[in-house]
Amino acid sequence: DLKNIIYNLKDLSKHSQISLFVDNMKGNKVNYDAIDYAIYVGANLIEIHTGYFSKHIEEGNLSVINEIESLINKANKSNLMVNAGHDLNLINLPHLVKIGGINEVSIGHAIVIDALNYGFEATIKSYINTIKG
């Protein structure tokens, strides 16, 4: 089972960090079960799948900010580091950064698209400035 696999991986290297990729929503409710499960199996951190968050931010549904914030807060209070990624871009990333409590974000194809439109250097600077707040 996953708990034993994680235990064995950590036993191989005391510096191993085990992350689980989790959905922030389960149906129409915040997925707190993902945090409980991550703790149960011995993960050190979670990476929140931000596709749902990103879609709703771009549609103007800002209530999703409170939902993901409560998940991040619970994870942080449970001593889990939090990473986030999926469909993040310069439109929705500021909302996520403002919440705080996130160790790292993964930004994929949005950087490539923005770099094609605005140039690589300008795009990287924009993302760095956004992340720094």
Positions of PLM-derived features:
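Extended substrate/RNA-proximal surfaces in nucleic-acid metabolism proteins
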Residues: 1-19
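Aromatic/hydrophobic pocket-lining residues that form the small-molecule binding cavity
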Residues: 2-5, 31, 64, 68, ...
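Generic structural signal for hydrophobic
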Residues: 9-12, 38, 75, 96, ...
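Histidine/lysine/aspartate-rich catalytic loop segments that bind and position anionic ligands
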Residues: 14-74
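Hydrophobic faces of well-ordered beta-strands that scaffold small-molecule active sites
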Residues: 18-22, 46-48, 82-86, 103-107
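Catalytic cores of alpha/beta
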Residues: 26-41, 84, 88-102
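Glycine-rich phosphate-binding active-site loops on the catalytic face of alpha/beta enzymes
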Residues: 45-56, 101-120
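C-terminal helical cap(s) of enzyme catalytic domains, especially alpha/beta-barrels
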Residues: 60-61, 114-133
